[in-house]
Amino acid sequence: DSPGGASDAQKTFDVNSLMPVKYEEIRDPHLKELSLSFDPLSGHYDDDGVSAKRLMKELNEHRLLQQSHWFSLFNPRTREEDLMLYNVDEHSGNWDTFAGNAAFFRVHVNEGFFVYASYSVVIHSKLTQHVVLPPLYEVTPHLFTNSEVIQKAYAAKMTQTPTKIFAHFTGSKSNPEQRVAYFGEDIGMNTHHVTWHLEFPFWWDDAHYDHHIERKGESCSSWVHHQLTVRFDAERLSNYLDPVRELHWDDVIHEGFAPHTSYKYGGYFPDRPDNVNFEDVDGVARVRDMLLFEERIQDAIAHGYLRYNGSTINIRDNHGIDVLGDVFESSMYSPRQDYYGALHNQAHRVLGSQADPHGKFALPPGVLEHFETATRDPAFFRLHKYMDNIFRKHKDSLTPYTKNELKFEGVNIDSIYEKGNLETYFESFMYTGVNIMLLTNDVDDVDIATYITDLAHKELSFQEDVTNEGDIGVLETVRIFAWPHIDDDHVEFSFNEGRWDVIEMDKFWVMLEHGHHSIDRSSFDSTVTIPDRPSFHDIEDRTSEAIPHGKELHIEEFESVTGLPNRFLIPKGLVKGKDMDVMVAVTSGEGLAAVEGLHRSANFAHHGCPEVRYPDKRPHGYPLYRPVDDERIITGVTNFKHIQVKVFHH
């Protein structure tokens, strides 16, 4: 049974009803009545109402961020306010209290931090563990589309003309970076990035929230950004661009960026011209501080330990990357924020403020100061290439793998091959513009359909023929990786470079009995990717049908949204075919699967989540996580197999 005294369908309906028109009046009669009559101090809480009393005191004393104003999580004060609301929701003891608070604060607090707190608590609260929210690009479309779309939507509303709007990427053909705008500006990719930071928030404090988020530093700070970086480089190679160059604090920011995007309230996102020198940002950080924090982290990597309370923390092991990830961000898990700083978070603020570093023009935050918009700016990938290279120094300092550590005795991959051609193409993706316009009772609503161009691929599958020579069945973990075969100079990547640039394609578990087996794995089943979330209207229709009949929603596949959009599994191909290397590794799952029954169900969060342990005890990227002294160590084990494929684009 769903906890809290309400069905999952009712919970989903209530929360969704507060989302799509967050800037206007609540339309559901029951929730509207709650917004007027509910008293947060009368609710049932597991913290005796401490959080509610604190937030209500701030609200009544008019100390909270005003409505109709931009909100940025990176701003310490607005983040503090947002977490006050999160705490009230998190400590709600039943659904009546949760729904009452949601309706009440929906009309009393800043719209931006209401949305952030709501999405955060739905992900982390036990009361809402099966609630599915609409995609953020429907709820806060101004953060996901350009101003041209916004203007056309308003024109359609005012003229009462249902319309289709075709969105364009920013920039022009004279800007080479425009060739890969389909990656950084994709609304699914933007949603993927912000969702990771919702699932693994840097502000999470175990002492306040009653549980530890396992491997947060490794999963979010290191691995997901590493995968974004290597995938971006693969897309660049497909478009005849050099791999992205890392950022340097003592160098200029080479690429400018004009977002052509506006806040709902607060003006346009600031532009940044080409070749801007870094400046100190008042009230945020000095450039020399960023260099100092980097030097201290580099020093820790070189020594293999961090200093903490007069002792040391060893990082020359599998857990070290998790510690370093927390230090980089830095999260509340960082051993010494005062000494190692917050390189990642401060870098986002420093980069985002370069258009107005001293506040002379009172400009709002730049795109890099919002997780929703950050990947739109090419500087995002320069920043994360810079951080990725520091992580690489750590990983390359680890003891190389030996053959005995990699082999799986008695298991052989006899052959692997792709079934059919690997083909990519561009298609139009439609989403509703329901939340772009002000919805009022004075002017009728009109249908606004927004279309964007997405990269997609046809279904692909790999077949692995595997033999288990042992007498008993064994649990096996199958890992599929890929990387570009040649670099931008048409030189074949060395194995060590390819190892670092691998794109994770899939990871799954199978139980193999004695004998020969053929494993046919479709891209549709990949645990790395997820489908697009259902739209607000789709969720509304499903809940409206389920609630009166006491039915279940059955939308479990959308509960975890940490994966990549499923259309981005493989990088863009070429008309003549893009050469890619594919490696399949079959390794032992016995004693290394952290969750029971993985071979019987794919319904697990691939990268883990706060209430579920990460399913694989191995480090992200295993068995290519650490270096090897000789490529023949990899090619010489029978449980690894490598082939070359071509990816075509039509």
UniProtKB/Swiss-Prot annotation:
Locate the residues binding Cu cation B: H344, H348, H384
Q: Where does Cu cation A bind?
A: H193, H197, H225
Localization: Secreted, Extracellular space
| Alphabetical keyword list | Copper, Glycoprotein, Metal-binding, Oxygen transport, Secreted, Transport
Query: By its UniProt entry, which InterPro entries does this protein fall under?
Result: Di-copper_centre_dom_sf, Hemocyanin/hexamerin, Hemocyanin/hexamerin_mid_dom, Hemocyanin_C, Hemocyanin_C_sf, Hemocyanin_N, Hemocyanin_N_sf, Ig_E-set
GO molecular function ontology, one term from the record: metal ion binding
- Cite the record's tissue specificity text: Hemolymph.
- KW Secreted (keyword) present: yes
Which SUPFAM superfamilies does the annotation name? Di-copper centre-containing domain (SSF48056), E set domains (SSF81296), Hemocyanin, N-terminal domain (SSF48050)
Q: Where is this chain glycosylated? A: S120, S172, N309
Give the primary localization class.
secreted
Extract the Pfam families matched here.
Hemocyanin_C (PF03723), Hemocyanin_M (PF00372), Hemocyanin_N (PF03722)
The PTM entry states: Contains one N-glycosylated and three O-glycosylated residues. The position of one of the O-glycosylated residues has not been determined.
GO CC annotation terms, alphabetical: extracellular region
Provide the assembly information: Hexamer of a number of different chains.
Cross-referenced PANTHER family, in alphabetical order? FAT-BODY PROTEIN 1-RELATED, LARVAL STORAGE PROTEIN/PHENOLOXIDASE
Q: Which family does it belong to?
A: Belongs to the tyrosinase family. Hemocyanin subfamily.
Describe the function of this protein: Hemocyanins are copper-containing oxygen carriers occurring freely dissolved in the hemolymph of many mollusks and arthropods.
Protein's name in the database: Hemocyanin subunit
**Species of the source:** Scylla serrata
**According to the entry, what is the taxonomic lineage of the organism?**
Eukaryota, Metazoa, Ecdysozoa, Arthropoda, Crustacea
